[in-house]
Swiss-Prot record:
Membrane topology, from the record: Multi-pass membrane protein
Membrane-traversing stretches: 11-31, 53-73, 86-106, 121-141, 221-241, 270-290, 327-347, 369-389, 451-471, 485-505, 514-534, 543-563
Tissues where this protein is expressed: Abundant in kidney and small intestine.
One GO process term, biological-process aspect: cellular response to lithium ion
Name this polypeptide is given: Solute carrier family 13 member 2
Catalysed reaction equations from the record: succinate(out) + 3 Na(+)(out) = succinate(in) + 3 Na(+)(in); fumarate(out) + 3 Na(+)(out) = fumarate(in) + 3 Na(+)(in); 2-oxoglutarate(out) + 3 Na(+)(out) = 2-oxoglutarate(in) + 3 Na(+)(in)
InterPro entries the UniProt entry points to: Na/sul_symport_CS (IPR031312), SLC13A/DASS (IPR001898)
Role, per record: Low-affinity sodium-dicarboxylate cotransporter, that mediates the entry of citric acid cycle intermediates, such as succinate, citrate, fumarate and alpha-ketoglutarate (2-oxoglutarate) into the small intestine and renal proximal tubule. Transports the dicarboxylate into the cell with a probable stoichiometry of 3 Na(+) for 1 divalent dicarboxylate, rendering the process electrogenic. Citrate is transported in protonated form as a divalent anion, rather than the trivalent form which is normally found in blood. Has a critical role in renal dicarboxylate transport.
GO molecular function terms attached to this record: alpha-ketoglutarate transmembrane transporter activity; fumarate transmembrane transporter activity; sodium:dicarboxylate symporter activity; succinate transmembrane transporter activity
Biased composition (Polar residues): 164-184
Length: 593
């Protein structure tokens, strides 16, 4: 009997792949309508995503075959959803992120900021959080965490091991950061990130048996501050994490008449304050939880001499690592300049409060802007393949003396093909296909009619419940899959109750990044947990409070500065459809400005 159960468990994924579609067949058979056919496809994909029976990207391809076979959409129409402008923006942004990582610019920025903040306990945690959050705004959460955790643990080990050396009159100024070697990296890759999938490093933290209780708690706080700030930092920019791009794509797909409400500038103006507030509150919470409330000690005020010497030794670790990078190379300078140019192009294309370069240069006769944020990102991405990585000159080929050799470009396609997370591109496309199929089949209108009773529930209460549910759900499932499934439903609900769609879609998107409680919730958590020194209970205890804080901050944002920014107190004309005629006859249910 035991062998039978073991066999079933071993083949559980194969069983799920065949049994789930069969078990759902009564729905389209008993209700032979397009709405039921589309619901069958959505439920099937949701179950595949939740159970990991198929890879996320493979599941995202199902609309390409299911929708045409069920008569919901033509195959050519479904295919168009897989490379929309949002996907182009994602690809262009990641081209620059790959260049930043390839030329080690992110490490130089990180170490420089840590040299400025110093190594006092509270400021050290703040320094790591600020650096990780900033990096996660522009590159993968996983990549920023994988880079920052070894640096954090190198500093921790120096702080823990230097006291005896200081007492003997010696220190360890030549300590070198031990990066995880390729041979020791695990092959496990998690797709639940905002972009680039990375191997999980398998470098363990020093055993807690040789630490004092105070040292162990400080190391736990340092580890958690890195993974938490990676998730928080991704909130701030439109390209920072996949759910943000899912929202922009769903807005374009579900409400094609909207005047580009969600763009890089508008998202940054709304989400950056959320990131700052959440980062500061998280810093205070981790400080209280792991360092105690002795702020004088945490900030290094009136320290004893041996404590100062220990921190000086740890500071030298960071200095040594920064010196090992050498002077800033031409490639780093070129990537940094292109990075600044791209950010400026994103902010000034169509800022809203003045005419940007998109309005002034690239608009048609009717005044419609012809370029998008994706256009700017691809333009800079192409330049990465055109700009040489060294100052052009008469460079000798080291393999063939006497022959000239041109330096390589900042990026090459082999590197991009290896680093680019094509699975996320397909996942985004699958989400847009689901939204379009739901609209074409009439399922969105049917859901909206069924959700009409929610019109009598206060909008803030509705949003609060949505945030709690999403924050809980995203602890166990991909944040991208969560938003892909829920945003079309929430959009239909908003139309049904005459509520601005962004009033429920924005909180859902932001809450999907509140994955703080479990190691499996997001790759940054898994990376930190794999280094050792943490128990699941440690992460859950710290994370549950951060989830609550995050939900409250989102509620504050959506009911304060979010209202005038997105005009959330009105029901927009671009959200009107045949199912919202009742919204014209009655005042919209919306939050007060």
């Amino acid at each position: 009997m035991a062998t039978c159960w073991q066999g079933l468990w071993a083949y559980r994924m194969y069983l799920l792949v065949f049994l789930l579609p069969i078990s759902l067949l009564p729905l389209p058979i008993l209700v032979p309508r397009k709405e039921a056919y589309c619901a069958y496809a959505i439920i099937l994909m949701a179950l595949f995503w939740c159970t990991d029976a198929l890879p996320l990207a493979v599941t995202a391809l199902l609309p390409l075959c299911l929708f045409p076979m069920m008569g919901i959409m033509e195959a050519s129409e479904v295919g168009l959803e897989y490379l929309k402008d949002t996907n182009v923006l994602f690809i262009g942004g990641l081209l620059l992120a790959i260049a930043v990582e390839h030329w080690n610019l992110h490490k130089r920025i990180a170490l420089r900021v840590l040299l400025l903040t110093g190594v006092r306990p509270a400021l050290l945690i703040l320094g790591f959080m600020v650096v990780t959050a900033f990096l996660s705004m522009w590159i993968s959460n996983t990549a920023s965490t994988a880079m920052m955790v070894p640096i954090a643990h190198a500093v921790l080990q120096e702080l823990n091991n230097t006291q005896s050396n200081v007492e003997e009159g010696s220190d360890n100024p030549t300590f070198e950061l031990q990066e995880p070697s390729p041979q020791k990296e695990t092959s496990k890759v998690d797709e639940k990130d905002n972009g680039q999938a990375q191997p999980l490093p398998a470098v363990p933290l020093e055993s807690g048996e040789h630490m004092t209780q105070e040292q162990l708690r400080f190391s736990q706080g340092m580890s958690l501050c890195v993974c938490y700030s990676a998730s928080i930092g991704g909130i701030a920019t439109l390209t920072g994490t996949t759910p943000n791009l899912v929202l922009q794509g769903q807005m374009t797909s579900l409400f094609p008449q909207n005047p580009n409400v969600v763009n890089f500038a508008s998202w940054f103006g709304f989400a950056f304050p959320i990131m700052v507030i959440l980062l500061l509150l998280s810093w205070l919470w981790l400080q209280i939880l792991f360092l105690g409330i002795n702020f004088r000690k945490n900030f290094g005020i009136r320290e004893q001499e041996h404590e100062q010497q220990r921190k000086q030794a740890a500071y030298r670790v960071i200095q040594t690592q920064y010196r090992l990078l050498g002077p800033m190379s031409f490639a780093e300078k070129a990537v940094f300049i292109l990075f600044v140019i791209l950010v400026l192009l994103w902010f000034t294309r169509e800022p809203g409060f003045f005419h940007g370069w998109g309005n002034l240069v690239f608009s048609d006769a009717s005044g419609r802007v012809m370029v998008s944020d994706g256009s700017a990102s691809i333009l800079i991405g192409v330049f990465l393949f055109m700009v040489p990585s060294k100052i052009p000159g008469l460079t000798q080929d080291p393999d063939n003396p006497g022959r000239l050799k041109a330096p390589p470009a900042l990026l090459n396609w082999k590197l991009v093909n290896k680093k680019m997370p094509w699975n996320i591109v397909l996942l985004l496309g699958g989400g847009y296909a689901l939204a379009k199929g739901s609209e074409e089949s009439g399922l969105s209108q049917w859901l909206g009619n069924k959700l009409m009773p929610l019109q009598h529930v206060p909008p803030p209460a509705t949003v609060f419940i949505i945030c709690l549910l999403v924050a809980t759900f995203t602890e166990c499932t991909s944040n991208a899959a969560t938003t892909t499934l829920l945003l079309p439903i929430l959009a239909s609900m908003a139309q049904a109750i005459c509520l601005h769609p962004l009033y429920v879609m924005l909180p859902c998107t932001l809450a999907s990044s509140l994955a703080f409680m479990l190691p499996v919730a997001t790759p940054p958590n898994a990376i930190v947990f794999s280094f050792g020194g943490l128990r699941v209970s440690d992460m859950a205890r710290a994370g549950i409070m951060l989830n609550i804080i995050g939900v409250l901050v989102i509620m504050l944002a959506i009911n304060s500065w979010g209202v005038p920014m997105f005009q959330l107190h009105t029901f927009p004309s671009w959200a009107h459809s045949n199912s919202t005629t009742h919204c014209l006859a009655s005042p919209p249910t919306a939050p007060s400005p």
